[in-house]
Amino acid sequence: MDIESDHEPKESSVDLEGRHDSIRKSFEADDIDVTDENTIFSTSRKEQSTIEPMDSFVENNIANSSSQQSVSEIDIQLPSSEPKEGVKEESNLIESNSLDNVQEINPQNTIGDKSAHTEEESSNDNLVKITAGTIISDIMDEPVVDEDDKLSEEDLSKEDLETTLKGDENYSSSQKEIYDNDETIPKPPSPEVEKIETSTSVENAYITNSQYNDTLDMEDQTSDLITTFEHENEDHEVHEVPSIHGMEGTFETVNLTSEAGNEKEFNNDSVVLNTTPKEMQISSLDAVDKLEDKPVSNDNIKANIESSTTVDRASSQLESENNESTFFVHNQNSSGQHQTLDFVASKPVTDTPELSKENTLVSSENLNDPKPNLPETEVDFGEPLEVEAPSFVVQNNSAVQPTTQKTSEDSTDLHTNEIPNVAQPPSSFEKENNKDTSKLENPDISSSPLSPTEDLFPNDPEEENLFSAALGLNSNTGSQPSETQSKPSIDPSESITVTDNQDSLLFSQLTNNALQAENATKVSENTINDEELIDDSEFTSLMSNFLESSTVQTNKYLPKSSASPPANAPIVSSDVHKNENAGTARRAPQSGAFVASKAKYSSPYDLPEEIVQVAQQKRSVSQNYNRQYSFQPRPATPSNPPRSLPPPSGQVNAPMSQTPNPISFAYQHGTPLATPTMRANSFNSYPASSAEPIRRPATTTVGHTPNLYSPKTNTYNSRHMAYEMTKSHINVISPGPSLQVNAPYTPTSGELGNKVSNPTKEFVSTSSYAPAANTRNAIIREPGILSPLSPRVQPVLSRRESIISMGSSASSYVPLEIAPRPMSSLEHTMNSAMSPGNLQRTANLYKPMTTPNAYNIKNSNQRETKYPYQPQAINYSEVTQPGSSSLPTSGEEANIIRSPGFTPLAAQKDATIYTPSHAQATLYGNMDNNDRDNEGIHDILQSDMEPVLPPHNSAYHANAPVSSHSEGLNNRLPISPLPPQLHKTGTPSHQHGFDTAETTAKQYAPSIPPNFNPNVSIDTMTEGVALPSATLDSDKSSLHKRSAELSRNNSPRPDFLPLPNQPLLHSNLHSPVSPVVDSNEDSRLKFLSTQRPAFSFGPCGTIVMAFSTPSGLYTTSGKGTKFIAGPIKIEKLGDVLTDEYRHLKEFKGPYLASNGKVDKHGKAEAIEWLSKYIDRLNQSLEYDDKNITLKDKLLLLQCLKMLLEVSDRKLIVEKLRPILLPSFEIPEPCNTATSVQELINPEINQDDSPIVASRYCTTSFLHRFYEYLLSGNKDEALTYALQQKQWPYAIIVAHSIDAKTFQGVVRTFCKSEVKESMLRSGVGVNLQLSLQLMSDAHASSMSEFSSSTSLLNLADQSQASNALVAWKELLYNIIANHYSDQKEALRVLGTLLLQENRVYAAHLVYILSLSPDVCSNKSNSLFELVGLSKHNLYPSHDDLFDVTQLTEVLELVFNVYSEKTPVFFTHLVPYRLYEAEVLAEAGEVSAARKYCELIGNYLNRVAKKSNNVDPGFVLRVRDLTQQILENSAGSEDISSSWLGRTVSRPRLDTVLSSLGSKFSKFVAGDPNFDVMRPATVGPGPFGKVASQKNLTVQTNTNNAAMESFYSDRPTSSGPSYQNRTPLTGQESMNMGVYSPYRRSTEIAENMSMDGNAYPYTPASQENPYTPRHSQEDNASVLSQQPLTFYSNVADNSYMPVSASQEPKMGMGTAFNMPTNEVHGVGAEMASPYQPLQPASAHLPNLQPTLAPINQNAYVPSNIAPAMGAMQSAPSAEAVAAPSESLNLNKDRSQQAKQAAAQNVADLVRQEEEKEKQKQKAKKNAESGKKGGAKGWFSKLLRRDESKDQPTVYKAKLGEKSHLHYDKELKRWVNDDGSDLSNQAAPPPPPPMALPKAGPPSAAPTSALPPAGPPAGATAISGNPGMPAPVPLTGKETAVPLSSMPNAPPSVASNAKLPPASNNRKVDPLEDILQAMPPPTTRKARGKTSKRYVDVMRNS
């Protein structure tokens, strides 16, 4: 028993050495074997137990009887060995197990002063009768033992062995409880003993013994007490010493002494006490009867809140002559362990059968089992014996064998069919023969084997029968032979055993359903009946003994054999294996045992019906029994309790029926403990082997009841609790001189005293919740004692105590009274995540003055302000010693030095560790430890904790504050902290991911800066000019020498010290600036002569490098050298680029071939590129490991690489797990071969984790639920099930109603039962989402997918304290389980991540859906480029290039997983062009060429299906391709290019020299190019598409308001010089390769009526890209035109809103005035807002002014139909003739008929001539073939003679237009005989040009350009994509354009025109015939059908 006090128990000085032999002889004389071990007391260290004589056992105070139902508590005051006034002995927890309704009672007992009792007190006659079955728990104090009162061996006599239980007025007795009050247990005839009934409303009922004067007589019996001490040291030695006869009620203290004579300490080792109690008699039951007859008075009720002793007293109805008493003393020490001392007192029995003494050791954790039957023994309570508190329950359980006689018929009916409501004690204890103890399950009790001994205390046969009846043994068990060997067991699940034959027979019948009625009679009489077996005993006994063939079962309650077993380790039997991943223990299937595989049994209830029914009955009994205690909520405990705490007794695979309260731990462990020793460091979260703090007595705190199973978090409400209440067994490490262990801060001698004891060995509790501590060591500290009066402030710490471990991290369970050391941000993150209560106290963080590598602590006190100190190099690979510093590794804090009076700064969010510059190193470098060890750093101010810049010096920092460091001025100004310094690996020192020993780095102090030079005065320093000292060099004229000295002083490192591998980067301090003149002339010359890039030109990476040439120069100082411009050299840019552009060369894109399919090497190249990219990101994370964006990007790249490597959808889940969840381990699968025991009774595998939902299903619920269903009301049944939280029934009913109801019930279940607070961060939300997704709920309807929930609450960026860390778990959960709404769930999750600006993470979620639709430029797409938000329209150049490459990789991924057609991102084509341009500029011509090939082939495919091709984009691709081909002419072949394949003309420069001119013509153009008639179709594949030349009519007057708005304007395909204008001030829109879009107002603005010589021709609506007509390039200067701010074209997307709106009222009259009035022009301009009128109403007779159309121009077919007035400009016919001239007159004039006949005759003649030419050419071709074949080059060079002839054109006048001249009729008639005179002519096509007046001319009318829009329409801006503007009406008096001044001469002055006459009508047919163009005279150019691609073919 544990006695906790502030003083150590006084040990007796009696030496046992001299009395050893004599006592052993006395034992041998009495025929007592000292090795006979009947009772074993296994003790643990530092716990004291005493066994007092019986006369003082009930001597003091039997009171405090309290019960709520049937539990009694008795306080027993016992004498103390060292009485002290005012000392309160802390009582121990006493728990007793009652099989009836057991409640939890937490009274407290106050044990007052005790004094030695005299013999007069012991002679009182007040005796108390204690019947058999009484269970008493007490606390026995140590009696006073004086040296004079110690008895000698001669004083020991049998008469003194008489012990009496004395009573006085203070004595009290508790109410007793009948042990077996159930009717199922047969009770032999015996006097009835009534129970003492107490009111349950009274919490504490005290029944004093003063009301009764009953005596309990004890007969005079002699007893020999054999005490054997087993001292289990580290070597497991066992020392046996003889026991001592206790005389006169005393025992002497025993000190063990080994053979070597060294005294052993009991507090560090386990001591086992073996006693053999003798018979002890307790007199008659009269006193008990009288005691029970007395009523309970309320006057005797006391309230004692300090009682902690619980005594349960249960008496069974046994015969009075056979009654026995058993005292259970349950002790629960500070470790939470339970110890029980059992003393059995019985009346002596003269005739008893032989019993085999077996010492059964019961685990202290099994306290819920009822008290097993014990044999009758007599115990002599003699002298108290000081022993260690036992850690195991000691029971003298002899394997009682019942008599071989059959019981009488009266006692045969021991079992009934009624299922009892309470459990019975264990059924039997089998006899075991002599076996080797090494084979037992508990070899640790004794290292020597147990020898068989003779039974000294045989039982009486009648008592045997009584035991059998009380225990409910089967009547057939007596028939078992005595030779049956069975291991003794107290396990209730193993209390019943049968033979193998019986087991096999019964099980064979049960499992095969072959239990026939006719076979029942054949079962032998000894066969155990199934109904008898399945009774109140646990059903697991049937499974263990019947269904498993193994006869020898290991005991679950015995610890496994180990070399050094832990004192309180959780006990697991050998047949139970621990599943570490799953955290549950499972029973291993026995060999040959019956198992039910999943293939055979889909459910446990598919087993034989007999087994299932019995199991259901048994489980129902267990639930009814345990439901009584369900009102006590189970405390919220960690999922894995701390290892230092013993597991709850209900956990150890015990049957639930044997567990009083398996739900509530408070019943078993809720009674307050004795106040344990409190240590200053409270809860130690480090491994037990790493720290050994000092143990200090705790200050008793009243009124607090600690919860053993709550986490050790010392919150404000629990700050008074005893901190260390548990102990654990660890491997003790003795501290050596250099030993360093982890330990947190503790208050020390500043306030609590200066004397601190040396550290000693002690066990340190461990917790499974504690973070894994680093293996590195720290300095051992001496923790102080916490005083309740101490203020809760930062304690004063000495320097030695402030040195912190490098490997330790701050505990998350530090109490509030203790101020911890400053924690890093990483530790804050860990603490916030691991603390259950999220306890975050504001840590006093401060920044150290420097990192450890800037100074040496050993030289830390002596400082100089004038001359800086240069410390020696520090090798960090050395072992860190106390007092020295160490380089911190990842997640660690640097060594911190404090002064006694230092006050930490305010808390900072991020406490970074930095490396100072050389200036700080010189400031703090000279530090000596001569005085610092004693006084600390008292001379360092608070400003020293911040980095300091040196004083003002232009060589260091131009803007630094002015200060001085000379003598007398020691002020230093703090500035912002410096960034971390880089080591040789480029990684900051505080973020090393590897051990510092592997990267040995040395740092040297810098040289003396000029500002620390003592020769520099203060005035000079304040002036900001650092001049060299006069003492450096007396020669003032030597500039080189002076500059050299100054440069050397200003250098950051001295010349004699080695430089690091990498310079210091990322420093705020500027490097010293040396003078311009350097002393090193050679280096200067080398620098000046180095080549430098001069300029770069072209898109293909051509760069010009310039060189400097030195030349002699004579100056006043002598000869010098000057550099002049030297030669230049043209090189490739890719050859001179630095490593910064290596990513341009590494990317081997595009990964798609030119045909759009995946390239065969693309996949391997992409994986290689991703691998290099991932390595670069990992290096970047070493610099900044908190960059969330980089981490998300790294995950994205890893997933892309994985998707390319796997290429199989089925393997994605498996390969994705290590990327998203690297630390996750898959739990072991469920056991496929589950035993029947586990299937039917799963309670045996219950865990100790917190219960989230516990609801029992009652019979009333089932009846009412069934009634609802019987009435057909499923809704009411569902509602009732939801109200009662019967989720299985509710979910089943909801599933039968509809899908929405089912989803709602599942959602309700998740909200109610899945407690987020009980689970790890993020698990609750993810589990809720998973369950709802399984119910086919829509992801967008879940409230968990909301930014307001804890799923993505990113207000706090701390990852550990936020549930955002679980988004990867949720992502993997969605992908791994393949939910039906998986894509929608991924979309919603990605949207939430985008809301929090987690772009890479969101895109990763989208990509894992493997749907190409997520990436496009459509409005409903999720993103357009990987890593770029869809709304981010302005990325940088580097970001755009990077995201384009990532998107290309994604395109390749989708192609790999595409099952049908290839995936091609059309929106990526413009970005690919940008990428090609960047690569071409960098010199990567081949990569750029691949992109151009891919884009060109895509455009060729698209142009065949759609006409929505941007001409500007086409020009950019064409120009870039041509330039790439020209730059790669020596190595590339144009025929392999997409551009070469579209051009029919091959490369001819390498064939024949005669073809050089042809090649020049191909490159430079046609030398015969007609400037007056330029070809509108240029070379190239897109010549016909972009054939319109630029409209360069433009002046230098620009509209600032519309500067940024451009219109979609195609440009010409001809040379760029053709589009240039010689006008000064004009803007050329086609000066470069590609011209941007032109402003929509540039066409119409600045164009006056005078200069409207080149009007704008809009495109048609059907084809917005209709080629437009060209105009003269040498146009004259145009006059100004008023600016128009508005337009009636409202749908022009390239115009601002103001330009497409009508003018408001009051805007001024200038907008509505005619143009001629504003500018003084006589012509009046029509208003653009007048109603629409016919074109003839306002258009003048304009002369043709446009350039002639090319007859070979390509005209699409969709513009052939006549254009209406709303679609195109008015035709020349409408301009030339009025509308009435269109009326055809049937009476044609003769002149018109003659003209038509002449035209037809000409056509016929031309056809005949053409036929003749064809025949002639055919003959020539035949003669050429006969002469010999020629090559294909000759065909190219051959000129066709027919081409020189004029081309004959056929006119199709209609279907019936074949005319012939009828001589009779003398006119032309049709072949079908139709009369032409009576037919109306078809509507003619619009003529090209028709002047109104002018003399006839022979020039063809085809030379006239088409008429443009009217003058009023010139102000309207045209758009290729919009319909043509509506022509505006004007007056007839408009001035003709030809009459305007400054108009260019008309090119149609010689055109043939019909005679002008206003008096006659013009025949339209005559106009048509006259408009026929003559044969062209232009030189033929040959076939051009293969020179271009008809992109408008299908349009």
From Swiss-Prot:
Checking Gene3D superfamilies in the record gives:
1.25.40.1030
Question: What top-level branch of life does the organism fall under?
Answer: Eukaryota
Give the way it sits in the membrane: Peripheral membrane protein
> Where does the record place the region Disordered?
1-32, 61-127, 140-198, 349-378, 392-496, 557-594, 629-661, 945-994, 1029-1063, 1605-1631, 1649-1675, 1777-1995
Note the Pfam families from the entry.
Sec16 (PF12932), TPR_Sec16 (PF12931)
Q: Which residues carry this modification: Phosphoserine?
A: S790
Name the residue ranges with Polar residues bias. 61-72, 93-112, 358-367, 393-406, 473-496, 650-661, 1609-1629
- Give the record's keywords alphabetically: Autophagy, Endoplasmic reticulum, ER-Golgi transport, Membrane, Phosphoprotein, Protein transport, Transport
UniProt lists compositionally biased (Acidic residues) regions at 140-152
Q: Where in the cell is it found?
A: Endoplasmic reticulum membrane
GO CC terms of this entry:
COPII vesicle coat; cytoplasm; endoplasmic reticulum exit site; endoplasmic reticulum membrane; ER to Golgi transport vesicle membrane
Where composition is biased (Low complexity), the residues are 561-574, 1899-1915
The record ties this protein, via InterPro entries, to: Sec16_CCD, Sec16_Sec23-bd
- This protein's major location comes to endoplasmic reticulum
Disulfide cross-links:
none
State where composition is biased (Pro residues): 635-649, 1881-1898
- What's a GO biological-process term for it? Golgi organization
* Signal sequence coordinates: none
Tagged with keyword Hydrolase: no
Transmembrane spans = none
Function recorded in the entry: Involved in the initiation of assembly of the COPII coat required for the formation of transport vesicles from the endoplasmic reticulum (ER) and the selection of cargo molecules. Also involved in autophagy.
Q: Which family does it belong to?
A: Belongs to the SEC16 family.
- Please give the subunit comment from the record: Interacts with dil1.
PANTHER family xrefs = RGPR-RELATED, SECRETORY 16, ISOFORM I
The protein's name in its UniProt record: COPII coat assembly protein sec16
The source organism is Schizosaccharomyces pombe (strain 972 / ATCC 24843) (Fission yeast)
State the gene name recorded for this protein: sec16
